[in-house]
Design a protein with these regions (language model features):
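Catalytic core of carbohydrate-active enzymes
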Residues: 1-160
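A carboxyl-terminal module marker
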Residues: 149, 164-176
Length: 176
């Protein structure tokens, strides 16, 4: 049913966007695909559902964005004249309703100067995150490739207040 909705779209298997297309609408009904990890509000980290039909309040100043539990989203500060050099400012980690271990192989964090072929000399940095969630503990483990540096000294990690975050490998890059 999720794929038959005309006013809802998936950015990928982990993020759903439900724009409000009708004036004066205060609530929308959408179908979320079932997942054990659960679906969460992007802005508040509030748990929504593990799937099925849900009704969401839609304030005028917010587009509903729903994120699957256990998702890691890097946020960039875009430099318009050189977008490939946009430094990662923040990483958002979403909780999960179940104990899980996820390796987001499709989401490595790549740090490169963007101008040279130094990556061929291993002068870039690739961090592939693995997220492990147990009760209210979120383990963030990075597989590190290369000897390059991140564009910023520190990257902010954003996650729910009631969750304890444990970093393994590369913790010197992050501010909790």
């Amino acid at each position: 049913e999720h794929f038959t909705q005309e006013e809802v779209f998936s950015l990928n298997e982990r993020i759903i966007v439900a724009p409000v297309l009708h004036q004066h609408k205060k609530k929308i009904n959408i179908f979320l695909p079932y997942c054990d990890e659960g679906w969460f509000d992007y802005f508040s980290f509030k748990f929504i559902s593990t799937g099925g039909w849900v009704t969401l309040e839609v304030p005028i100043n917010k587009i509903p964005i729903i994120v699957r539990g256990g998702t890691l989203i890097p946020k960039l500060k875009v430099v318009f004249h050189k977008p490939h050099l946009a430094p990662i400012e923040e990483i958002i980690l979403f909780p999960s309703k179940i104990n899980i271990a996820i390796t987001q192989k499709n989401m490595p964090l790549i740090f490169d100067d963007g101008d040279t072929n130094d990556y061929q000399k291993n002068k870039n940095l690739i961090l592939t995150p693995k997220i492990k969630i147990e009760k209210n503990k979120l383990f963030l483990i990075f597989n590190k490739i290369g000897n390059g540096k991140a564009q910023k000294e520190k990257i902010i990690l954003k996650y729910p207040n009631n969750t304890k975050l444990i970093l393994k490998n590369c913790s010197n890059y992050f501010i909790k």
